[in-house]
Design a protein with these regions (language model features):
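Polar/acidic, low-complexity leader/linker segments enriched in S/T/G and N/D
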Residues: 1-20
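Acidic, small/polar-enriched beta strand-loop surface segments
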Residues: 1-4, 178-316
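Oligomerization/assembly interface segments of phage tail-like spikes and tubes
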Residues: 28-44, 77-87, 208, 268-279, ...
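Amphipathic, non-transmembrane alpha-helical segments in extracytoplasmic/periplasmic proteins
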Residues: 30, 39, 82, 97-125, ...
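Surface-exposed cap/loop segments at beta↔alpha junctions
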Residues: 44-125
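Glycine-centered loop/turn motifs
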Residues: 49-57, 143, 188, 288
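Short beta-strand and beta-hairpin "edge-sheet" elements
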Residues: 56-82, 292-323
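Short beta-strand-centered interaction patches in the first periplasmic/extracellular domains
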Residues: 72-79, 84-89, 127-203, 207
Length: 326
C-alpha cells in the first residue's frame, strides 16, 4: 500500500516514501484520540512538499486516511496529524427535524439509512454506497454524533460500518460483521492468552427491600444460578450462598424493585476476563467483528468484539495491532 499526500481537492502531490513513522488509530470510541493519525518526517522532507492544514494523507482502497489539522515542528522532526475518516464522522451531530423529538429511521435498507443520517453534512468528499446491503434497520437519534449513531444502528442488526477511500471519495457502507467465536482463538491456534476469574466479590443471592416499614415492607429475593440464570425459586443455603441486601425504599412498584434487584445481581456476578493477543494471528479483523478465546489450561472462554485497530508503518515495516472488548 502507498501512503498518498494530496491537496484539499484530493489532487495527489506525492507518494510518501521518506518518513520516520506513520501511526493511525481506528476504533469504536467517539473521542478524538480514538480515531486519529500522526506522521513523522524530517524537516527537509516536509520543506520539499509541505503538508499543511486541509491536506489529506491516505491509502487508496483502505480505511486508513484523514485530514491534516495539526503541524508541529520539534527539533529536526515535523509531526502532522488529524482525524481519520472515521474521526471526521464523530464531529457531526444528528439533530431531529424541526418540531420532532428524534431523527427516526424506520425499516430502511441499511445503506439508505446511513445516507439519510449523513445527508449533506460531510460535503462531496464522503459518499454512501448505493448497493443493496440486504439488511433492514431502524433507529431513533437525538443530538447524537454521527459515528455513534451509525454504529449503534448497525450493531443491533449484526452489522458494521465499512469505510473505504476509493481514490476520489470516502465511501461508507453497511456490511455484516463476522463472528469468529466458532473458531476459538485458543493456544492451539497459537493465540497467546491470559485468563482470570474472580469470585471473591461476587454474590449469588440478593434480598431487596422496597416500600413500607418492618413487617409491611416489600421484600424480593432473587438467586443467580451457576449458568447465569436469575430465579425467584429458593435455592439451598450453605457455604456457596453469598447474600447481600439492596435497600431501595423509593421503588415505586414491585416490578421496579425486582428489576433493580436483577441488575444488581448481574453486576455482582463473578468477573471473568481473558486477554487475547490478536497481533500474531493472520486474520484481517474488522472493527465490530467478534472473536472468541479459550484458555485450554483453565477452560475459561469468552467472546469480544474488535474495538480498535492501530496501524503502524516505520523502518521495520507495516503492522496492525488489535484490541478487543475495551
Amino acid at each position: 500500500m502507498e501512503l498518498i499526500h494530496a491537496k484539499a481537492n484530493i489532487e495527489e502531490i506525492q507518494s510518501l516514501t521518506e518518513f520516520d513513522q506513520y501511526e493511525a488509530v481506528s476504533g469504536l470510541g467517539f473521542k478524538y484520540a480514538d480515531n486519529d493519525f500522526e506522521l513523522q518526517v524530517e524537516e527537509a522532507v516536509w520543506e520539499k512538499y509541505p503538508m499543511i492544514k486541509g491536506h489529506y494523507l491516505y491509502e487508496v482502497g483502505t480505511e486508513w486516511g484523514g485530514m491534516v489539522e495539526d503541524v508541529n515542528h520539534v527539533g529536526t522532526t515535523v509531526k502532522v496529524g488529524g482525524p481519520t475518516w472515521r474521526g471526521m464522522l464523530a464531529r457531526k451531530i444528528i439533530s431531529p427535524p424541526a418540531g420532532q423529538a428524534y431523527k427516526a429511521i424506520t425499516a430502511m435498507e441499511a445503506n439508505q439509512a446511513i445516507a439519510a443520517l449523513v445527508g449533506t453534512s460531510l460535503g462531496p468528499l464522503f459518499a454512501v454506497s448505493t448497493a443493496d446491503s440486504g439488511m433492514t434497520v431502524s433507529g431513533s437519534f437525538r443530538y447524537t454524533n454521527l459515528l455513534a449513531a451509525i454504529h449503534s444502528m448497525l450493531q443491533q442488526y449484526g452489522a458494521r460500518l465499512e469505510i473505504i477511500f476509493d481514490g476520489t471519495q470516502v465511501v461508507l457502507s453497511a456490511v455484516s460483521s463476522v463472528d469468529y467465536t466458532d473458531t476459538e482463538l485458543s493456544q492451539e491456534y497459537e493465540a497467546p492468552l491470559e485468563s482470570s476469574v474472580a469470585y471473591g466479590e461476587a454474590y449469588n443471592h440478593v434480598i431487596a427491600l422496597g416500600r413500607g416499614e418492618l413487617t409491611e415492607r416489600e421484600v424480593v429475593e432473587l438467586w443467580r444460578l451457576d449458568d447465569g440464570t436469575i430465579t425467584t425459586t429458593t435455592q439451598p443455603a450453605g457455604a456457596n450462598d453469598k447474600q447481600f441486601v439492596l435497600d431501595y425504599p423509593n421503588a415505586e412498584s414491585l416490578e421496579e424493585l425486582t428489576s433493580s434487584a436483577t441488575d444488581k445481581l448481574i453486576e455482582s456476578s463473578p468477573v471473568e476476563s481473558i486477554g487475547i493477543n490478536l497481533d500474531e494471528i493472520e486474520i484481517d479483523f474488522k472493527l465490530g467483528d467478534v472473536v472468541g478465546g479459550r484458555d485450554k489450561v483453565t477452560g475459561l472462554t469468552i467472546s469480544k468484539p474488535i474495538t480498535q485497530k492501530i496501524l503502524k508503518i516505520d523502518k521495520n515495516g507495516r503492522k496492525i495491532n488489535y484490541k478487543a472488548g475495551e
